[in-house]
A protein has these predicted regions:
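Structural signal for well-ordered, non-membrane alpha-helices
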Residues: 121-128, 145
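C-terminal helix-coil-helix/basic helical segment that borders enzyme active sites and/or dimer interfaces
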Residues: 128-135
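Short catalytic-site patches enriched in acidic/histidine residues
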Residues: 1-5, 95-100, 104-107, 135-172
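A composition/biophysics-driven feature that prefers long, compositionally simple stretches
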Residues: 1-119
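Active-site pocket-lining segments that scaffold enzyme catalytic pockets across diverse folds
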Residues: 117-124, 137
Length: 172
């Protein structure tokens, strides 16, 4: 699992040719472990500019100008860093590309989504049948997490709200 960080890790995917992953030096082992294919991993240290590596990948592919599409939720400091490193390129939203990729699902992806849904619904049924008077929200959340694990899932989060709190899931 990868989470957002103040340190840039990204993948440069040219229209033609092999992709390259850019990541902090200390992340290289876990990046390589998660790769199913490809082998171009370029690392940077704390005192180095990771966006210079983006420029290097583009140069290595013989690209001198054009558009760089960036996934729409990428944070500004990354977009700005790329634009500063390669001002001859236009950094644009990749939403038209990424949206299409996310909307289309293979049968295997649909099967995985169904399996996750089945685990979640079975965990809900277990929790519903086992809630007792006097239980605290933390007790209910723990029961949901435990049921999810016992069914082979990995709980991402669970939130149980009771009484007035259930009307204000994001606070007041």
């Amino acid at each position: 699992r990868w989470w957002r960080s103040e340190r840039f890790t990204g993948v440069v995917i040219p229209a033609e040719g092999e992709f390259a992953i850019i990541t902090p030096y200390f992340e290289e082992p876990s990046v390589r472990e998660s790769m199913a294919f490809g082998d171009d991993v370029r690392t940077w240290n704390e005192h180095e500019d990771p966006f210079a590596l983006v420029a290097g990948v583009l140069k290595d592919h013989g690209l001198q100008r054009g558009k760089i599409a960036v996934e729409e939720t990428v944070r500004h400091f990354i977009v700005d860093g790329i634009q500063q490193a390669v001002p001859e390129f236009d950094v644009v939203s990749g939403k038209p590309i990424t949206r299409g990729c996310r909307m289309l699902k293979t049968p295997a992806e649909i099967a995985l989504m169904q399996m996750a849904n089945d685990v979640t619904m079975a965990a809900y049924r277990h929790v519903h049948a086992n809630i007792d008077k006097g239980m605290l929200p933390a007790d209910i959340s723990a029961m949901m997490n435990q049921a999810t694990r016992q069914l082979g899932g990995r709980p991402g989060f669970s939130m149980a709200l009771l009484n007035d709190a259930s009307a204000y899931p994001h606070g007041t």
